[in-house]
Amino acid sequence: MLRNGNEGMSTIPGFSQIQFEGFCRFINQALAEELDKFPTIKDPDHEIAFQLFAKGYQLLEPSIKERDAVYESLTYSSELYVSARLIFGFDVQKQTISIGNIPIMNSLGTFIINGIYRIVINQILLSPGIYYRSELDHKGISIYTGTIISDWGGRSELAIDKKERIWARVSRKQKISILVLSSAMGSNLREILDNVSYPEIFLSFPNAKEKKRIESKEKAILEFYQQFACVGGDLVFSESLCEELQKKFFQQKCELGRIGRRNMNRRLNLDIPQNNTFLLPRDVLAATDHLIGMKFGTGILDDDDMNHLKNKRIRSVADLLQDQFGLALGRLQHAVQKTIRRVFIRQSKPTPQTLVTPTSTSILLITTYETFFGTYPLSQVFDQTNPLTQTVHGRKVSCLGPGGLTGRTASFRSRDIHPSHYGRICPIDTSEGINVGLTGSLAIHARIDHLWGSIESPFYEISAEKAKEKKERQVVYLSPNRDEYYMIAAGNSLSLNQGIQEEQVVPARYRQEFLTIAWEQIHVRSIFPFQYFSIGGSLIPFIEHNDANRALMSSNMQRQAVPLSRSEKCIVGTGLERQTALDSRVSIIAEREGKIISTDSHKILLSSSGKTISIPLVNHRRSNKNTCMHQKPRVPRGKSIKKGQILAEGAATVGGELALGKNVLVAYMPWEGYNFEDAVLISERLVYEDIYTSFHIRKYEIQTDTTSQGSAEKITKEIPHLEEHLLRNLDRNGVVRLGSWVETGDILVGKLTPQIASESSYIAEAGLLRAIFGLEVSTSKETSLKLPIGGRGRVIDVKWIQRDPLDIMVRVYILQKREIKVGDKVAGRHGNKGIISKILPRQDMPYLQDGTPVDMVFNPLGVPSRMNVGQIFESSLGLAGDLLKKHYRIAPFDERYEQEASRKLVFSELYEASKETKNPWVFEPEYPGKSRIFDGRTGDPFEQPVLIGKSYILKLIHQVDEKIHGRSTGPYSLVTQQPVRGRAKQGGQRVGEMEVWALEGFGVAHILQEILTYKSDHLIARQEILNATIWGKRIPNHEDPPESFRVLVRELRSLALELNHFLVSEKNFQVNREEV
């Protein structure tokens, strides 16, 4: 939080700052911490010792550029050099060696792994420490338990049973006496009794036999091992038994870590040093004391709130990368030990360089990281749909992943909004579906304390004395466990009269409760109305007038907006659009002042301080979501520029502001049922004037391989048995030409796969050709890359990547231009979404009193029940802004200045627009905001006045071209013989339970029978029915059962139930009855 000259003002922190801070901590601290833990590798037989030093490690600059890494499908990484020492007898060697490559974060806060942009999102987990809870059993008796959570996520429970004996549950099945556990950890009975507040309870439950088991540490360890590992018989104490117990129990369940030690000390009032990060007997005894106090009413009876953010911690990119680095160093240790043995077998003199070789040992580091980025649930493909998604993706927090919750098992309480989320995690922005409440987004002012993993939120200190004493502390960052002790005034309540503040009462938050208290009792207040929301929520104008569910949908749908060919910034915004676009890094900002020498579509040449700087531009590059990323220069040749000025704008930005959609004229009225149930009626103007036209880039790739016989596949244009028309776009190498227009079914890359002679089907004609002309039959199979359905477009790029002569990969990029069409999804910024149902000629659209036809018609019934009234304010203010040539940037909760502030603003602007344009219909006092409009087909006015306005409408990535699908025949499931599911597999349309009910309701028995049997899983009938349908013949009626019935019979047979079936008809019914 930076403060400028104006004392009350503050700037919003960089939105990608959290990712950068995390990675910097990994590079500067975490690497050294892990290298310090690397043990000295000793081989006593040969008097050899190998050691790595944390001091003075170096990371080289990446050997390739970002663009080249993406182009050649490589990992953007940096080589790590560390100091190593090898002691061999009396010979000591020191060298700086490379131990491998580490992926490097780029300016977007992402990593490039094998040419793909990936991002690591933050995980929110329960902090290590101890948590108490009480619950009632089936008899209504309170059961008190204390759960100890380790840094690894392992859990152990302390509980008191009905006989008042204290147990430690170390696994689901095994519980161990607390005395045995304490003794196994190194305490004798006297020390235990001296360190507890209730020694009589500890002495009451062990009998003579149990006391004998804990006489010494060795006996206690044997008893503990027998109970923990469920091992019977007589065990003998040994070092290997201790090591196994250490590995299986103490390491996983007793390592608290730095955060766990702090939490344990704080919860149990202990003063154990912070560097002692393991669970001690003293911790266990203090925890048991507290549990006894809760049981007998002498301790604090409050349960720990597991959902409070003070009991959670954030695992950022630094922690996750540090874990992987430690894992890689562990593998490196084993590899070095093997290499040492190999060196002595060969009887060669070792050096640090020979022990860590680039080919075998140091490759472990990069492979560990590539596996992590490829398989770890919190490593995701970077969402590049539009600039907003790029900014928001790195600010996600997830409860899912290793050590966290799962979508299937998480409770309602763990998903719900908690008072401690206020100003830290957005109460609105979360995913819909099974993961609702489990993935969230950080509030815009929140920051992560990387030392303790807590989320902090800024507040203004009200106390005048403190402000005078220490001015820089005017803004304080409070962690979740600190803000419970402060009276916090909400910044979005009605503003105070500056003159008589002391006499005012204000709503405030104290200890998770909302109170109304006097102003002088307030300690801190919110700094910004946006403080509680994420970026997505902060971009919704008039959010305070919307239902939270619709705001949630809006913040999600803004991330699905497709960049349009001609972007336009919103008339009504919130003021956060500029910073969102800036932090997405899609635009190019001048880093120094200078003069423009020249600009073109590929680069900008800038002269600064006597140097010529070339700034490359992104030119029609495919994003991870197949949208088009493109930068256009915005500075003319010869212009002098200043530092911070925009040189080139990216997709979906205008003038440095986010521009995801278009301002279009909308009317809220029904129209012939075409906007029933959220359907949207649009004008053909949006199609012909390319208002909602977007560009999409599809990638198609093919790779040559070596067959099982050792023959190599070949890329060529010479493909037999194919029409010349399909090969028309190929060059002499067999690859499609740049700039070609390709249609469905065209060949993009010609490829032949060799086959052995026995695989080729020799037909009679082949023998004749060989006998007459001496021609050999082709023994190759055509396996070319063909353009799939819906892939038509212009070839804009072809990449030929050849790692070795036999391994060739060809990638073809095709640009598609998509106008808006029936079936596309559009949405506003208030959760008002819909599908295009009809495109009307502009002359048939309803038109205003000045003759302007409306662009979109929404259903008015979509507003009252959804309670997203913000769209009404936005459309009316947008109309006024369009007529007055103004843009508005309105912070939320403007009712804090006066009652009905939003309504007053909208009406005053509409009235001004009406006066300026001399159009009285813009503001009619009887029905402000509404107007009489006319039917385009008849010219008659509609009966009721209609709300018209300019709304900012987005086109979403759910487009009909990627959804529409049909099938006659295709692949079938092997077991059920029913059509497979999904568009990608050319699957069929599912007729489910409810669809069957609908058909039953209409009594269409024959159609129902065809759908469920003949057309689906009747092997013989489905072949005949296709032929009968094509030729218009009668559909045959087969009497044998379909395949799914046979599957049912076989399943019953596997349960030892025999089911026989036979056909009963009019002819054989009498016979069968007599036989029976």
UniProtKB/Swiss-Prot annotation:
Alphabetized InterPro entries for the sequence: DNA-dir_RNA_pol_bsu_ext_1_sf, DNA-dir_RNA_pol_su2, DNA-dir_RNAP_su2_dom, DNA-dir_RNAP_su2_hyb_sf, RNA_pol_bsu_bac, RNA_pol_bsu_CS, RNA_pol_Rpb2_2, RNA_pol_Rpb2_2_sf
The protein's name in its UniProt record: DNA-directed RNA polymerase subunit beta
One Pfam family cited in the UniProt record for this chain: RNA_pol_Rpb2_2
Gene Ontology CC annotations of this record: chloroplast; DNA-directed RNA polymerase complex; mitochondrion
Described purpose of this protein according to its UniProt entry: DNA-dependent RNA polymerase catalyzes the transcription of DNA into RNA using the four ribonucleoside triphosphates as substrates.
One Gene Ontology term from the biological process aspect of the record: DNA-templated transcription
Substrates-to-products reaction catalysed: RNA(n) + a ribonucleoside 5'-triphosphate = RNA(n+1) + diphosphate
